[in-house]
């Protein structure tokens, strides 16, 4: 559940989803409601918001045919926000719901933010981040508390993106463990005790960036998806 309210209009949102969270949203269901008067461009605005929120969470890479995101406006407030006002409010709501979905993902013990910096394009940044988010070896390493930057590089290298495999920097929870694709700081100084794990990958081929949220791969995820008959 997420809410936005000022003295002119209000936006509220709800979402359901614990597994199969991946573009195109998989089995996730979300409804966002506002009392604002929506502009003719509401669909376009909401698509941009979804592309940068719901479509940038990726729990397990599995998709389905049953995803839905709805934006509903009653116009009851009588206030018509500007496009930028509306987009900002929707980003707040959908961003919060996206983070909550990943935090509540099946079997999750860690929320993982994978930030790509200095990519050739935003789409390349998304591709590299998503390749890491869907890499089971990397997700298992995070579950085990292993700051294995080699798995980060290996995952990044599978992406269909412009990169130089010899010049990539990697930070794990703020510790630069890899510079120009070679060891840097002692990886044992990386602390994975907190719920949030931050992976920063600097491709050094441009100035675009993007972040994907995912989670680790645990025993509980395997159990929850195997201990029943469909």
Where in the sequence are the language-model features?
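A structural signal for small-residue-enriched, beta-sheet-centric alpha/beta enzyme cores
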Residues: 1-230
């Amino acid at each position: 559940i997420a809410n936005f309210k000022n003295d002119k209009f209000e936006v509220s949102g709800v979402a359901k989803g614990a597994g199969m969270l991946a573009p195109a949203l998989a089995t996730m269901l979300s409804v966002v409601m506002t009392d604002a008067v929506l502009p003719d461009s509401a669909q376009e605005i909401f698509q941009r918001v979804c592309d940068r929120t719901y479509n940038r969470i990726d729990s397990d890479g599995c998709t389905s045919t049953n995803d839905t995101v709805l934006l509903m406006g009653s116009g009851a407030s009588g206030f018509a926000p500007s496009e930028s006002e509306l987009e900002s409010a929707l980003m707040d709501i959908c961003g919060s719901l996206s983070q909550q979905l990943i935090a509540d993902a099946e079997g999750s013990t860690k929320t993982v933010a994978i930030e790509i910096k200095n990519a050739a394009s935003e789409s390349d940044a998304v591709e590299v981040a998503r390749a890491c988010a869907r890499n089971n070896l990397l997700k298992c390493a995070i579950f085990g508390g292993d700051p294995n930057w080699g798995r980060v590089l290996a995952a990044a290298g599978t992406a269909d993106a412009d990169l130089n495999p010899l010049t990539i920097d990697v930070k794990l929870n703020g510790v630069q463990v890899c510079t120009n694709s070679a060891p840097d700081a002692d990886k044992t100084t990386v602390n994975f005790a907190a719920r949030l794990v931050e992976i920063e990958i600097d491709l050094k081929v441009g100035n675009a960036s993007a972040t994907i949220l995912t989670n680790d791969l645990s025993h509980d995820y395997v159990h929850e998806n195997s201990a029943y008959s469909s």
